[in-house]
């Protein structure tokens, strides 16, 4: 690994200014620069590492298709002190497997995977890809933002036909978070891949020890790391010590506790990742101008650049395309984007010619409502037979559902004299809030898996700019006793491998979501018979009563759905119960048609039987009912590539009517093309009508 020095943290522009007029002219924003220079937002040094494509590589970290598919995760020579290379390998392994179905029957190795080429054929062997990585922080000079930027340049990159694909992390994952969702496709296409962690990045601070993570996942104390940490809680050491005394074994997380509302900058940092990629490509392929420095070979707009990713990363790509004023982005392809749309009067979402009950709500609204109601709605008749996605005994989960319904009823929040009727009313309220009946069997697993509670707590903290010491709504993040759920000291600190195994949103890697009640902190599911209803109700009230500045901070993350006439594709599963399609993609497409009118080049593909987490598709009940949305994300990328390179028309907006695999839960037959009809140029009755602010999706 080599280091390329960047700017000073105290004054990022000073070092560049001292180098003289020619180099100063190459700084961020100068379209006429002749010398390649790091953008002004790059803080500290750039780490450059070459990978041979055998012992280590860009896509699989040397594991290959077989290693990524193995249930045995890569280990460490010294478990107490893993190296940066070992942590990187584990991060690539964990993040790849977190976004796709990794089972052969589910499509791995057949429809996707390192061995599968872009035509869908098994021709690439273990699929290792040689190339170079560039790693650095983006910062605003404060040393507290520290967004991780990473550029991978494959050895197959053709300087005469350059391309970039963005792979902004999904969720709150680290910088490799979208390696399976967008990075893999870009690397196979021979494109540079521009990653960033969105300023969340799995950064944590262990309050009791003061240990924090660095850019490469290795650890340091907050005092020794200084401004080089991925994240350090902003409170003083004395305040944190007092907090630790009252609430031991707690953790601060960057997305939740940075007090920066990082989502408001997700579009900006995605653009910065692209600009950093331009710098890296000029550094690698630009002419040498004075024996040491490189000239400018590529200027904004010279490189075919597709902004791509899924979930939060997909929303970031859309936001970046809207904010692009310099021609960095050529086109957009995103899957299941989590996006908060600023809706204007007259915009409408319809299904089957009838207006849907609700659309375009922000995540802060629908997530806090779902977190409150889902444990009760899970007991509804319509949810019978839902996949079970919890480590708790079924009896405990059933008790939680009954007690949550009873507490909701006592509070006047649901009606009904018994659990069945209360659950039916809870589900009806979710329908009224824009959830589809297609998601009925997903309401239970979204809460049981703790996906929805995790999101409700993390985003409420972010949108209120809360500190870890605030214990917002009496929730915090802590290690717990695996039997009782009570807060307890860990046998081994989860910080050691957090960079490699964590996902940035507790519960993750042994750090759990706890409710701080009268008896101390306990796993939120077990803290009270109704699974911490008081905390869930508090989170809901933050939104409904517009408390602690939540409305202002949510407004800061809304987008206008103006893609500036860039060609774009959105893919979304109709059954998505985490990011409901009515509030995200359908709302975005409708608003885009009002904003851009006939100049819009946006196509929307809605996938029946598609849901948010392809990694769940191997779970019994998921395997028989749901199909991989990732398959269509890759098809959409190929369609966009052909559109940009050969002028092939993008297929119009349409519903893709997939066929579930069926069979016995846990033993569904192998996925085949019979389950996955293609995106077509003439969708007929499956066409989605979009015009003048109105979207009408066929039933």
From Swiss-Prot:
Biological process (GO) annotations? butyrate metabolic process
The signal peptide stretch is 1-33
> What's the protein name?
D-(-)-3-hydroxybutyrate oligomer hydrolase
Q: What is the lineage of its organism?
A: Bacteria, Pseudomonadati, Pseudomonadota, Betaproteobacteria, Burkholderiales
Recorded hits in Pfam families, A to Z, give:
3HBOH
- Per the UniProt entry, what species is this protein from, by scientific name? Burkholderia mallei (strain NCTC 10229)
Catalytic residues (positions):
311 (charge relay system)
The answer on whether this UniProt entry bears the keyword Signal reads: yes
What domain of life does the native source organism fall in?
Bacteria
Under Enzyme Commission nomenclature, its number is 3.1.1.22
- Entry function: Participates in the degradation of poly-3-hydroxybutyrate (PHB). It works downstream of poly(3-hydroxybutyrate) depolymerase, hydrolyzing D(-)-3-hydroxybutyrate oligomers of various length (3HB-oligomers) into 3HB-monomers.
This protein's pathway: Lipid metabolism; butanoate metabolism
Q: Which InterPro entries match?
A: AB_hydrolase_fold, OHBut_olig_hydro_put
- Which GO MF term does the entry hold, naming one? hydroxybutyrate-dimer hydrolase activity
Give an example GO cellular component term for this record. extracellular space
According to UniProt, the reaction catalysed is: (3R)-hydroxybutanoate dimer + H2O = 2 (R)-3-hydroxybutanoate + H(+)
Family, similarity comment: Belongs to the D-(-)-3-hydroxybutyrate oligomer hydrolase family.
Q: Which UniProt keywords apply?
A: Hydrolase, Secreted, Signal
As for subcellular location, the record says: Secreted
């Amino acid at each position: 690994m080599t280091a390329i020095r960047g700017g000073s943290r105290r004054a990022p522009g000073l070092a560049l200014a001292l180098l003289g007029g020619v180099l100063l002219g190459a700084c961020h924003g100068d379209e006429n620069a002749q010398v390649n220079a790091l953008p002004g937002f790059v803080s500290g040094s750039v780490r450059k590492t070459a990978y041979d494509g055998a012992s280590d590589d860009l896509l699989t970290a040397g594991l290959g298709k077989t290693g990524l598919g193995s249930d045995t995760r890569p280990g460490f020579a010294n478990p107490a002190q893993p190296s940066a290379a070992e942590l990187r390998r584990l991060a690539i392994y964990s993040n790849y497997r977190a976004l796709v179905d990794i089972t052969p029957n589910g499509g791995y190795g057949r429809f996707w995977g390192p061995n599968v080429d872009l035509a869908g054929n098994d021709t690439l062997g273990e699929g290792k890809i040689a190339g170079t990585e560039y790693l650095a922080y983006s910062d605003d000079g404060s040393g507290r933002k520290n967004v991780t930027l990473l550029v991978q340049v494959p050895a197959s990159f053709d300087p005469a036909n350059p391309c970039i694909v963005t792979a902004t992390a999904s969720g709150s994952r680290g910088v490799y978070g979208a390696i399976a969702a967008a990075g893999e496709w870009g690397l196979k296409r021979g494109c540079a891949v521009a990653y960033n962690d969105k300023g969340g990045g799995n950064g944590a601070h262990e309050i009791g020890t003061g240990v924090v993570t660095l850019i490469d996942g290795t650890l340091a104390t907050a005092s020794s790391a200084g401004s080089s940490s991925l994240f350090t809680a902003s409170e003083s050491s004395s305040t944190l010590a007092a907090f630790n005394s009252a609430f031991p074994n707690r953790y601060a997380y960057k997305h939740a506790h940075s007090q920066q509302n990082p989502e408001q900058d997700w579009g900006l940092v995605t653009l910065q990742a692209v600009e950093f990629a331009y710098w890296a490509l000029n550094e690698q392929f630009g002419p040498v101008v004075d024996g040491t420095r490189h000239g400018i070979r590529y200027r904004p707009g010279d490189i075919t650049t597709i902004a791509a990713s899924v979930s939060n990363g997909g929303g970031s790509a859309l936001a970046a395309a809207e904010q692009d004023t310099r021609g960095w982005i050529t086109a957009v392809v995103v899957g299941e984007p989590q996006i908060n749309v600023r809706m204007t009067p007259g915009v409408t979402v319809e299904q089957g010619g009838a207006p849907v009950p609700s659309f375009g709500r922000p995540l802060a609204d629908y997530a806090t409502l779902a977190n409150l109601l889902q444990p009760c709605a899970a007991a509804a008749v319509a949810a019978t037979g839902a996949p079970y996605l919890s480590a708790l005994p079924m009896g405990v989960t059933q008790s939680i559902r009954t007690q949550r319904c009873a507490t909701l009823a006592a509070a006047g929040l649901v009606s009904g004299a018994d659990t069945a009727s209360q659950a039916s009313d809870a589900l009806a309220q979710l329908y009224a809030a824009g959830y589809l009946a297609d998601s009925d069997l997903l309401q239970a697993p979204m809460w049981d898996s703790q996906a929805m509670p995790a999101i409700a707590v993390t985003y409420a903290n972010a949108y209120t700019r809360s500190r870890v010491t605030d214990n917002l709504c009496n929730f915090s993040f802590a290690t717990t006793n695996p039997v009782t759920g009570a807060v307890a000291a860990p046998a081994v600190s989860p910080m050691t491998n957090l960079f490699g195994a964590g996902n940035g949103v507790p519960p993750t890697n042994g750090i759990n979501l706890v409710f701080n009640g009268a008896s101390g902190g306990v796993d939120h599911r077990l803290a009270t018979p109704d699974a911490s209803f008081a905390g869930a109700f508090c989170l809901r009230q933050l939104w409904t009563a517009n408390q602690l500045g939540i409305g202002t901070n949510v407004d800061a993350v809304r987008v206008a759905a103006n893609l500036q006439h860039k060609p774009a594709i959105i893919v979304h599963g109709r059954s998505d119960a985490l990011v409901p399609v009515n509030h995200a993609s359908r709302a975005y497409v409708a608003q885009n048609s009002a904003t851009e009118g006939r100049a819009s080049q946006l196509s929307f593909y809605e996938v029946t039987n598609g849901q948010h987490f392809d990694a769940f598709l191997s779970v019994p009940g998921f395997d028989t009912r749901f199909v991989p949305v990732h398959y269509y994300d890759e098809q959409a990328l190929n369609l966009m590539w052909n559109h940009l390179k050969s002028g092939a028309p993008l297929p119009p907006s349409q519903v893709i009517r997939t066929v579930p695999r069926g069979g016995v839960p846990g033993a569904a037959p192998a996925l085949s093309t019979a389950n996955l009809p293609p995106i077509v140029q003439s969708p007929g009755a499956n066409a989605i009508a979009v015009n003048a602010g109105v979207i009408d999706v066929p039933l």
